[in-house]
Every structure is written in structure tokens, then in C-alpha cells.
Swiss-Prot record:
Protein family membership: Belongs to the peptidase C13 family.
Record's GO cellular component terms: endoplasmic reticulum; GPI-anchor transamidase complex
EC number: 3.-.-.-
Protein name: Putative GPI-anchor transamidase
GO aspect biological process, one term: GPI anchor biosynthetic process
Pathway connected to this protein: Glycolipid biosynthesis; glycosylphosphatidylinositol-anchor biosynthesis
Top-level taxon: Eukaryota
Organism: Drosophila melanogaster (Fruit fly)
Function: Mediates GPI anchoring in the endoplasmic reticulum, by replacing a protein's C-terminal GPI attachment signal peptide with a pre-assembled GPI. During this transamidation reaction, the GPI transamidase forms a carbonyl intermediate with the substrate protein.
Residues at the active site: 165, 207
Keyword Signal among UniProt keywords: yes
Keywords, ordered alphabetically: GPI-anchor biosynthesis, Hydrolase, Protease, Signal, Thiol protease
Length: 355
């Protein structure tokens, strides 16, 4: 009896050792220094909602603000299909603009933030409180184009950036209507209840900006504001050639930080929250992180301003269909392929993906 039990024990112990060895072998296939994105964040995709809520030529800086953030998130990998850009006025084509088709955020004209490939989703009088709230909550009207929908889900990290003229508890849209802090809080709460975000970063550059996040109660929300209640947010500098301010102070220093960030940067949200100290911003930057479960100093900046790049390492054999002489034609000393090559990884993906 004792011998039988001893044999069983040895067999079980051997199986445990074997399973541990297999697990170790599987882990060892990761390249040195490789960090799985899932270890850093639970999100699976990124979205950005960028809003300039004011119009008229003297608010040129607000368009420059939003286009500066647009430039940054697009450069860091978020595609236009996952960026909703709302601009209340078209400064690039304004009759007062001496540089048609161009918008700069600096009097030295270092960066044309309008560029050649800006995709504006809501333009002019389409930028309304109703459309903004419908966008956030997923209640867009029938017939709304896909490019005008926030198609986020429970795995989405969402960046919301707002700029314009505001006051204690409100932000003006088009100088004719307002969205209140309570309406913003309700919209974000609906997003949470409908599983429309995993984590949300709320960023606002306006006067008394911190008042806009005071009503928030939804989980996983991190917020930053360019000024506290009772403070004005100030502009940075004037371009004498066009007679208006170019950009606001907070967004200017935020862009200065983001321009140094690369897609695989180790810079953190915690660092970003400190980009505009009072000595340069004049106003006091407000931060709200009581609803956010992670330490901002351990959250990569690209969790919100970049696009996640899921990577899976496989040890499966890859069959490569090699070319032969019949696959090429020669035309004036140029070699041109007639048939596309196929690389097929067995047992990993359905064959229709390679058709």
C-alpha cells in the first residue's frame, strides 16, 4: 500500500515539475526587455474627442489649441478614425488670415498645425452642446456618418480635450449656449454605464476650468484643468502680423512636453500633470485624481495620447511561399512582381485573412 502511494506521489510530483517547466519555457520566448501592454494597462484601444467650442477671429488661439493636441495624438499613433475633431470656426480659411490654409500656434511659424491632412469631423455650427453630448453618450441621430461617432467600448481609453471661453461651472459653445459641469458629469456617467470607456482623461483649457470637473463621480476618470475656480486662463503671446493671440499658456506648455514624447516613451501622465507650473502659467493648474485608481506617475503618457500596439509572440512555424522565375516580369530593366507573396502562420489565424 505504501509503495503504491509512493508511486502516485512521484508521478504527481513529476507532472507538477513538467508543467512548471512548460510554463517557464513559454515565458522565456518573450524578447529581453519586452513588456506586455496588458501588464501596464487593461485598455485595448484609444480614442480622442477634441473640441474647440468658440468662434470668431479673435479666438484664433482656441483653434490653435485644439489643433496642437490633434497633431500630438495623431503623431503618437491614434488614427483619424479614432479621433473626433470639433472646430467651431474655420480660421485656416478666414478672410482675415494672411496665410490661407494655415494655422500656427507660434509667431515664429514653426509648426503649421492645420497641415495637409487634418480631418475635421464637426465644423462650424455643427459644434453644439447637443451634438457633443450625443457624441459622448452614443445617441447620435440616424444617418450620422461613422466618422462622427465615438465608437468606443469597455476597453477604450478616451481622451477628452475642451478649449474655449468658460466660467464657474460652464463652458460656452459658439458664444450662444453653454454646457454645465453637471451636464458634463451626467454625460461621462452615461458613458460609464454604457461601457463606453475603460479609463478617461479629461483635459480642459479655459477660465475657471477646474469647475468643470467638480461634479464628476464616475470611476476611472483623471482630470486636469488650466485654472482653478476664480482664476482666468491666460494666453501665451501675440503675433503682430495677424493681431491676435496664437495659443493659450497651458496648451502651449502641454504641446512643448508632448513634442518630446515618442510612441514608446517612458514619460508618464504624472509628469504631464506638472507641465505648466504657476510661474509660467500664471493661473494654477488643477488636477483631480480621486476617481482614478492608478498612480499617474506609473501611467505611460501614451496610455491616453498614443495608440496601443498589442503584440503577441508565437513559436509556430511560418510557411513562406518563395518566388520563382515565373513570378516576375522585366520591363526596361525594372523587375515587377506578377503574383503577391503569401506568408501563412499555421494554426494562428483564419485563412480568409490572407486572401
Amino acid at each position: 500500500m505504501f509503495n503504491i502511494m509512493l508511486v502516485k506521489f512521484v508521478v504527481i510530483f513529476a507532472l507538477i515539475l513538467a508543467s512548471c517547466r512548460v510554463e517557464a519555457d513559454n515565458t522565456s520566448v518573450l524578447p529581453e526587455g519586452f513588456v506586455d501592454a496588458a501588464q501596464r494597462s487593461t485598455h485595448t484601444n484609444n480614442w480622442a474627442v477634441l473640441v474647440d467650442a468658440s468662434r470668431f477671429w479673435f479666438n484664433y488661439r482656441h483653434v490653435a489649441n485644439v489643433l496642437s493636441i490633434y497633431r500630438s495624438v495623431k503623431r503618437l499613433g491614434i488614427p483619424d478614425s479614432q479621433i473626433i475633431l470639433m472646430i467651431a470656426d474655420d480660421m485656416a480659411c478666414n478672410a482675415r488670415n494672411p496665410r490661407p490654409g494655415q494655422v500656427y500656434n507660434n509667431a515664429n511659424q514653426h509648426i503649421n498645425v492645420y497641415g495637409d491632412d487634418v480631418e475635421v469631423d464637426y465644423r462650424g455650427y455643427e459644434v453644439t452642446v447637443e451634438n457633443f453630448v450625443r457624441l459622448l453618450t452614443g445617441r447620435t441621430q440616424n444617418g450620422t456618418a461613422r466618422s462622427k461617432k465615438l465608437l468606443s467600448d469597455a476597453g477604450s481609453n478616451v481622451l477628452i480635450y475642451l478649449t474655449g471661453h468658460g466660467g464657474d461651472g460652464f463652458l460656452k459653445f459658439q458664444d450662444s449656449e453653454e454646457i454645465t459641469s453637471q451636464e458634463l458629469a451626467d454625460g461621462i456617467q452615461q458613458m460609464w454605464e454604457k461601457k463606453r470607456y475603460n479609463e478617461l482623461f479629461f483635459m480642459v483649457d479655459t477660465c475657471q476650468a477646474a469647475s468643470l470637473y467638480e461634479k464628476f463621480t464616475s470611476p476611472n476618470v483623471l482630470a486636469v484643468a488650466s485654472s482653478l475656480v476664480g482664476e482666468d486662463s491666460l494666453s501665451h503671446h501675440v503675433d503682430p502680423s495677424i493681431g491676435v493671440y496664437m495659443i493659450d499658456r497651458y496648451t502651449y506648455y502641454a504641446l512643448e512636453f508632448l513634442e518630446k514624447v515618442q510612441p514608446f516613451s517612458k514619460r508618464t501622465i504624472g509628469e504631464f500633470l506638472q507641465v505648466c507650473p504657476k510661474r509660467v502659467c500664471i493661473s494654477t493648474v488643477g488636477v483631480r485624481k480621486d476617481l482614478y485608481p492608478r498612480d499617474p506617475h506609473k501611467v505611460p503618457i501614451t496610455d491616453f495620447f498614443g495608440a496601443i500596439r498589442p503584440t503577441r509572440v508565437s513559436t509556430d512555424r511560418i510557411n513562406v511561399t518563395l518566388a520563382n522565375e515565373d513570378d516576375f516580369i522585366f520591363d526596361k530593366d525594372k523587375m515587377v512582381t506578377k503574383k503577391p507573396f503569401k506568408i501563412v502562420m499555421e494554426s494562428q489565424f483564419p485563412s480568409e485573412l490572407f486572401k
